[in-house]
Amino acid sequence: MGDEETIFTITEANLDSGLRGVPVGTCKTSFVDPIEGVHYVGYPVGDLANLEEEDVIYLLMHKRLPSPEESEAFHAELAHRAEEIPTGALRVLESLTPGSGHPMDWLAIGLMSLGAADTTGDARADAMNLIARMPELMARIFLLRGGKPEGLRPRKPELGLVENFVHMLGVEGDEAERMGRMLRFFFILHMDHGGGNLSTFSGKAVASGRASIYASIASAMNALSGPLHGRANQACLEFVQRLSLIHI
């Protein structure tokens, strides 16, 4: 122990700061360089921004980019898992009043409902199921909150995660293409951030007790719902929207 490097000294002031500035874990999938920005498994995120989102997810899960054959198989697995979504579990969302509550509250309820219906106990299977089913969950929440539950379109297995989300919302034509580009850029940019923010820390803390993937992610999303954390995501979306008017 005496030969180990000290990486941080905790002071009394740190204990009164809500862990601000205190390292709470390590991350092997990404890091943030103060000059060059975010890197995923050694790749600058800018080099990944034009890839399909599924391939970037594969990179984060396997620490390498997929071959064409692996990419095709990964897409097919996600499409199959999306088809198996327990839609009955999401009826709880239909009992909520359109426009009521915060969207993040709806998301946490939806996540826990999916988990109650289909937790397998296998971390990879549950993670893949959740990744595959998030587009439909988010589309349902958006339409139900807007009082338009009948607007949900059936998913298309040949479409990717972002494309299916846009499709299920009923967006078409040039608007669908532009929205898809913007959301894919936003999605890839937010996939991983070094593991030190509040939502990631909260999700890891809950997972450390061997809670399910669904419970852990719901906890992370509840942490994200606070304005001191989630407001940054909103500001980023506003920034991406401005960029989309220029050249995305």
Model-predicted segments: where are they?
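Hydrophobic alpha-helical bundle cores within soluble ligand-binding/oligomerization subdomains
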Residues: 1-246
